[in-house]
Amino acid sequence: MQQSLAVKTFEDLFAELGDRARTRPADSTTVAALDGGVHALGKKLLEEAGEVWLAAEHESNDALAEEISQLLYWTQVLMISRGLSLDDVYRKL
């Protein structure tokens, strides 16, 4: 699989989100989501998973990719909230 130069990897995103969690910028959606707690994050994950399913059924591949990217973002925010590392997840793959 070939990547373009502008691609953000799963690892890049996790590092970026971890940095936001540590530095807590005032205008950060990630910080607000973390402050909302696991229950709110779980609800958001369910919403995003539903949007992925609907996009797979009714939308273009580009729209589906966008929805999947949002699901991955929220999954990583939940991981950070619970203190999971990428290696914790990779060991289960």
Curated annotation (Swiss-Prot):
One GO MF term: ATP binding
Protein name: Phosphoribosyl-ATP pyrophosphatase
UniProt similarity note: Belongs to the PRA-PH family.
Gene: hisE
Listed pathway(s): Amino-acid biosynthesis; L-histidine biosynthesis; L-histidine from 5-phospho-alpha-D-ribose 1-diphosphate: step 2/9
Presence of the UniProt keyword ATP-binding in the record: yes
Enzyme class: hydrolase
Organism (species): Mycobacterium tuberculosis (strain ATCC 25618 / H37Rv)
Gene Ontology terms: biological process: L-histidine biosynthetic process; response to host iron concentration
